[in-house]
Amino acid sequence: MNYRYRAMTQDGQKLQGIIDANDERQARLRLREEGLFLLDIRPQKSSGVKTRRPRISHSELTLFTRQLATLSAAALPLEESLAVIGQQSSNKRLGDVLNQVRSAILEGHPLSDALQHFPTLFDSLYRTLVKAGEKSGLLAPVLEKLADYNENRQKIRSKLIQSLIYPCMLTTVAIGVVIILLTAVVPKITEQFVHMKQQLPLSTRILLGLSDTLQRTGPTLLATVFIVAVGFWLWLKRGNNRHRFHAMLLRVALIGPLICAINSARYLRTLSILQSSGVPLLDGMNLSTESLNNLEIRQRLANAAENVRQGNSIHLSLEQTAIFPPMMLYMVASGEKSGQLGTLMVRAADNQETLQQNRIALTLSIFEPALIITMALIVLFIVVSVLQPLLQLNSMIN
């Protein structure tokens, strides 16, 4: 959630800006850590002008980051770099955004402050890394790391989507074929069986019952599914229900461990990027939670950051969240002892992502043939149920 704040620096200079945080308490805490004296803070109201998200894809944002890193490494002034990238961009909205950022820089604002006007495009992680690069004088290397980080996330997401396309299409086709057979084909073939004086086989009676039920209650079922889906969506938007739902997902077999594995790898990778860019550990732990989608996991990791603030070790604090597997915790503990925390966190994230990709591939390799076999058995049942009374009728005629 975005919060608009007014604060005063230790030098007495007043400033205002926007900060992303889970809640107001975390926003106040992070501003205090930056050495700011908070004057006012409130949730940012949704406004059609200021908070409208520009339609810019993740790949375009990554390309912009990579180009800016290259031009910065070539010692080209920042405002000139933004002008060049904006002119070459095929996305008019991105060009408009870069022009506004460039105007803010020409007015004397640093890049990190200029990006605050577009919080939905440049999130707090992006802005914090840019700010760290500006302070350290290593903006180009930090932007390279940020581009690599975004590319890695895109690759993982693309692989997951690509691996799910075929099973989803196969499932949709299978369900569609069964519905067409039961509602259109089977009734026409089996309507002649109704007048048979002899009792129909059990499988045929079951098939006729399913077909009749689906034809009578089909529209009602569709309406019920739609109403339930809309009701569930409205329920998620009320109060703390989304948090409760996310906590419930973590207790579901297979789904819970998968969510924990994906989020734990993303968290450690984000934290390693922040730490290697000069962001303080506690700030990095709080910022890393914002890259996660599950609210329950975000809350647990926020509690872990608070434990570290109180003097506990990182690996013990992370262990209490019940999110990280033993191997990841072991590598974090080794990194704490050896002083190579960032390096070992990256390795732990790499190992976890590779393991999860292998598990997903194995699961899908089992699911696809299982679905085909199930579909074949359903079609076989329909064929047998139709043929049995036909053969029975043929024997009666003979």
Curated annotation (Swiss-Prot):
Membrane-spanning ranges: 165-185, 217-237, 366-386
Disulfide bond sites: none
GO molecular function, one term: metal ion binding
Subcellular location, record wording: Cell inner membrane
Further information: Part of a cryptic operon that encodes proteins involved in type II secretion machinery in other organisms, but is not expressed in strain K12.
Binding partners and assembly: Type II secretion system is composed of four main components: the outer membrane complex, the inner membrane complex, the cytoplasmic secretion ATPase and the periplasm-spanning pseudopilus. Homodimer. Interacts with GspE and GspL components.
Protein name per the record: Putative type II secretion system protein F
Gene responsible for this protein: gspF
